[in-house]
Amino acid sequence: MSRRGTAKGKTAKYDPIYRNRLVNMLVNRILKHGKKALAYKILYGAVKKIQQNTKTNPLSILRQAIRGVTPDIAVKARRKSGSTRQVPIEIGSTQGKTLAIRWLLGASRKRPGQNMAFKLSSELVDAAKGRGGAIRKKEETIKMAEANRAFAHFR
Protein backbone atom coordinates (compact mmCIF):
# COMPACT_ATOMS: atom_id res chain seq x y z
CA MET A 1 0.00 0.00 0.00
CA SER A 2 1.25 3.46 -0.88
CA ARG A 3 2.34 5.78 1.92
CA ARG A 4 2.28 8.80 -0.30
CA GLY A 5 -0.47 11.33 0.43
CA THR A 6 -2.98 12.51 -2.12
CA ALA A 7 -2.28 15.72 -3.99
CA LYS A 8 -4.44 18.71 -3.12
CA GLY A 9 -6.55 20.01 -5.97
CA LYS A 10 -5.40 23.33 -7.38
CA THR A 11 -7.91 26.07 -8.06
CA ALA A 12 -7.61 27.98 -11.30
CA LYS A 13 -6.25 31.50 -10.94
CA TYR A 14 -8.06 34.61 -12.12
CA ASP A 15 -7.35 36.54 -15.29
CA PRO A 16 -5.78 40.01 -14.63
CA ILE A 17 -8.19 42.03 -16.81
CA TYR A 18 -11.58 40.26 -16.64
CA ARG A 19 -11.07 38.62 -13.20
CA ASN A 20 -12.44 35.39 -14.62
CA ARG A 21 -11.23 31.81 -14.15
CA LEU A 22 -12.61 30.61 -17.50
CA VAL A 23 -10.55 33.22 -19.34
CA ASN A 24 -7.42 32.08 -17.50
CA MET A 25 -8.18 28.42 -18.29
CA LEU A 26 -8.57 29.33 -21.97
CA VAL A 27 -5.30 31.29 -21.98
CA ASN A 28 -3.43 28.35 -20.46
CA ARG A 29 -4.79 26.03 -23.17
CA ILE A 30 -3.94 28.48 -25.99
CA LEU A 31 -0.40 28.76 -24.60
CA LYS A 32 2.34 27.23 -26.77
CA HIS A 33 6.08 27.12 -26.01
CA GLY A 34 5.68 29.28 -22.88
CA LYS A 35 4.51 32.38 -24.79
CA LYS A 36 1.82 33.51 -22.38
CA ALA A 37 1.81 37.13 -23.56
CA LEU A 38 0.96 35.93 -27.07
CA ALA A 39 -1.80 33.70 -25.68
CA TYR A 40 -3.32 36.68 -23.83
CA LYS A 41 -3.04 38.78 -27.01
CA ILE A 42 -4.90 36.10 -29.02
CA LEU A 43 -7.69 35.74 -26.46
CA TYR A 44 -8.16 39.47 -25.88
CA GLY A 45 -8.24 39.99 -29.66
CA ALA A 46 -10.92 37.31 -29.96
CA VAL A 47 -12.94 38.88 -27.12
CA LYS A 48 -12.69 42.30 -28.81
CA LYS A 49 -13.90 40.82 -32.13
CA ILE A 50 -16.85 39.15 -30.35
CA GLN A 51 -17.71 42.52 -28.76
CA GLN A 52 -17.61 44.28 -32.15
CA ASN A 53 -19.60 41.63 -34.04
CA THR A 54 -22.34 40.79 -31.53
CA LYS A 55 -22.65 44.09 -29.59
CA THR A 56 -23.17 42.05 -26.38
CA ASN A 57 -21.06 41.12 -23.38
CA PRO A 58 -18.27 38.87 -24.74
CA LEU A 59 -17.85 37.04 -21.41
CA SER A 60 -21.48 35.92 -21.48
CA ILE A 61 -20.94 34.59 -25.03
CA LEU A 62 -17.80 32.80 -23.80
CA ARG A 63 -19.69 31.23 -20.86
CA GLN A 64 -22.59 30.26 -23.12
CA ALA A 65 -20.21 28.65 -25.65
CA ILE A 66 -18.40 26.63 -22.99
CA ARG A 67 -21.69 25.62 -21.35
CA GLY A 68 -23.00 24.47 -24.75
CA VAL A 69 -19.93 22.38 -25.54
CA THR A 70 -19.42 20.87 -22.05
CA PRO A 71 -20.28 17.14 -22.14
CA ASP A 72 -21.97 15.24 -19.30
CA ILE A 73 -20.70 11.87 -20.46
CA ALA A 74 -17.58 10.66 -22.28
CA VAL A 75 -16.09 7.36 -23.40
CA LYS A 76 -12.93 5.85 -21.99
CA ALA A 77 -10.99 2.93 -23.48
CA ARG A 78 -10.86 -0.11 -21.18
CA ARG A 79 -9.15 -3.44 -21.89
CA LYS A 80 -11.26 -6.43 -20.99
CA SER A 81 -10.44 -10.03 -22.01
CA GLY A 82 -8.11 -9.10 -24.85
CA SER A 83 -10.28 -6.47 -26.53
CA THR A 84 -10.43 -2.74 -25.98
CA ARG A 85 -13.91 -1.39 -25.36
CA GLN A 86 -15.14 2.18 -25.26
CA VAL A 87 -16.82 2.47 -21.85
CA PRO A 88 -19.15 5.43 -21.22
CA ILE A 89 -18.36 7.33 -18.01
CA GLU A 90 -19.91 10.38 -16.37
CA ILE A 91 -17.54 13.29 -16.00
CA GLY A 92 -17.45 16.12 -13.47
CA SER A 93 -17.89 19.81 -14.14
CA THR A 94 -14.17 20.72 -14.09
CA GLN A 95 -13.20 17.89 -16.41
CA GLY A 96 -16.15 18.76 -18.65
CA LYS A 97 -15.02 22.40 -18.89
CA THR A 98 -11.48 21.28 -19.68
CA LEU A 99 -12.75 19.03 -22.48
CA ALA A 100 -14.98 21.82 -23.80
CA ILE A 101 -12.07 24.27 -23.91
CA ARG A 102 -9.87 21.69 -25.64
CA TRP A 103 -12.57 21.00 -28.25
CA LEU A 104 -13.23 24.72 -28.84
CA LEU A 105 -9.54 25.42 -29.43
CA GLY A 106 -9.11 22.35 -31.64
CA ALA A 107 -12.09 23.34 -33.79
CA SER A 108 -10.91 26.94 -34.04
CA ARG A 109 -7.39 25.84 -35.08
CA LYS A 110 -8.89 23.76 -37.91
CA ARG A 111 -11.00 26.67 -39.18
CA PRO A 112 -9.89 28.60 -42.25
CA GLY A 113 -9.15 32.23 -41.53
CA GLN A 114 -6.64 35.01 -41.12
CA ASN A 115 -5.36 34.58 -37.57
CA MET A 116 -6.10 32.64 -34.40
CA ALA A 117 -7.99 35.50 -32.74
CA PHE A 118 -10.41 35.68 -35.68
CA LYS A 119 -10.85 31.90 -35.81
CA LEU A 120 -11.37 31.63 -32.04
CA SER A 121 -13.92 34.44 -31.98
CA SER A 122 -15.97 32.92 -34.80
CA GLU A 123 -15.84 29.45 -33.18
CA LEU A 124 -16.98 30.87 -29.82
CA VAL A 125 -19.89 32.73 -31.45
CA ASP A 126 -20.88 29.60 -33.40
CA ALA A 127 -20.69 27.43 -30.27
CA ALA A 128 -22.85 29.92 -28.37
CA LYS A 129 -25.44 29.64 -31.17
CA GLY A 130 -25.28 25.84 -31.08
CA ARG A 131 -23.27 25.07 -34.19
CA GLY A 132 -19.63 24.68 -35.17
CA GLY A 133 -16.90 22.06 -34.92
CA ALA A 134 -16.84 21.86 -31.13
CA ILE A 135 -20.60 21.20 -30.93
CA ARG A 136 -20.18 18.49 -33.57
CA LYS A 137 -17.44 16.90 -31.44
CA LYS A 138 -19.72 16.91 -28.38
CA GLU A 139 -22.55 15.27 -30.35
CA GLU A 140 -20.09 12.65 -31.66
CA THR A 141 -19.01 11.83 -28.10
CA ILE A 142 -22.62 11.52 -26.93
CA LYS A 143 -23.40 9.18 -29.87
CA MET A 144 -20.38 7.03 -28.99
CA ALA A 145 -21.53 6.83 -25.37
CA GLU A 146 -25.06 5.87 -26.45
CA ALA A 147 -23.76 3.21 -28.84
CA ASN A 148 -21.56 1.68 -26.13
CA ARG A 149 -24.13 1.84 -23.35
CA ALA A 150 -23.97 -1.96 -23.08
CA PHE A 151 -20.42 -1.68 -21.71
CA ALA A 152 -21.35 0.76 -18.92
CA HIS A 153 -20.92 -1.96 -16.28
CA PHE A 154 -17.16 -2.27 -17.07
CA ARG A 155 -16.28 0.85 -15.07
UniProtKB/Swiss-Prot annotation:
An example Gene Ontology CC term for this record: small ribosomal subunit
Transmembrane segments: none
Subcellular location: Plastid, Chloroplast
Gene Ontology BP annotations: translation
Disulfide bonds listed in the record: none
InterPro entries named among the record's database cross-references: Ribosomal_uS7, Ribosomal_uS7_bac/org-type, Ribosomal_uS7_CS, Ribosomal_uS7_dom, Ribosomal_uS7_dom_sf
Keyword annotations from UniProtKB, A to Z: Chloroplast, Plastid, Ribonucleoprotein, Ribosomal protein, RNA-binding, rRNA-binding
GO molecular function: rRNA binding; structural constituent of ribosome
Matching CDD domains: uS7_Chloroplast
Top-level taxon of the source organism: Eukaryota
Similarity-based family: Belongs to the universal ribosomal protein uS7 family.
Protein purpose: One of the primary rRNA binding proteins, it binds directly to 16S rRNA where it nucleates assembly of the head domain of the 30S subunit.
Assembly notes: Part of the 30S ribosomal subunit.
Protein name per the record: Small ribosomal subunit protein uS7c
Organism: Sagittaria latifolia
